[in-house]
């Protein structure tokens, strides 16, 4: 699973990592969250500002529900024959729908079923600063999600760090990347961990 702030390069790195598996004739399925299912589509509408914004707790439940559907409908069936590489998973839920230790613990609880059903072998956090992520988002020139402001990215980065600290004893989460690393260099760093 690939995690990181908006603008960190997650989507590009996810694509390149899936291609790396294919280069080595290793079957790979690439996916993402929120999904294109009914719940994921609602989430995307909210994030784009097309739908009214829900409370953080309601959003956390929506993401967790979308994840359960994703696990049952896509991830588990593909794991039978493939490596699955996913752009976002439950760490994003923890980072984006929490604002302190108490709310982080709540989001962890909402994701307990997902954690039981499908715990990743590796979770990679692409560690790019909020300031650099914001520069990249601005450079894209696309419309921004509700989380794509520098102030919001700083909060989300702090929550990612809190989630990683909380889960490091039970999850195999690895920080990779930096502001100056290219997506290919980040994939090379990930590949070293995967092939150990």
What residue ranges belong to the model's regions?
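A glycine- and Lys/Arg-enriched "phosphate-lid" helix/loop adjacent to the NTP-binding pocket
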Residues: 91-158
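ATP-dependent small-molecule kinase phosphotransfer cores
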Residues: 20, 26-109, 114
């Amino acid at each position: 699973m690939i995690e990181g702030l908006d603008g960190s390069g997650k989507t590009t790195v996810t694509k390149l990592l899936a291609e790396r598996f294919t280069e080595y004739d290793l079957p790979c399925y690439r996916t993402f969250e929120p999904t294109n299912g009914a719940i994921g589509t609602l989430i995307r509408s909210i994030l784009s500002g097309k739908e009214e914004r829900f409370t953080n707790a309601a959003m956390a439940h929506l993401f967790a529900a979308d994840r359960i559907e994703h696990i049952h409908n896509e991830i588990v069936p593909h794991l039978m024959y493939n490596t699955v590489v996913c752009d976002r998973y439950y760490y994003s839920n923890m980072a984006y729908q929490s604002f302190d230790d108490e709310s982080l613990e709540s989001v962890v609880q909402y994701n307990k079923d997902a954690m039981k059903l499908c715990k990743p072998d590796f979770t990679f956090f692409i560690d790019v600063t909020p300031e650099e992520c914001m520069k990249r988002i601005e450079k894209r020139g696309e419309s921004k999600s509700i989380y794509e402001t520098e102030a919001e990215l700083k909060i989300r980065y702090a929550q990612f760090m809190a989630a990683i600290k909380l889960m490091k004893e039970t999850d195999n989460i690895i920080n990779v990347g930096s502001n100056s690393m290219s997506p290919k260099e980040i994939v090379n760093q990930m590949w070293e961990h995967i092939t150990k």
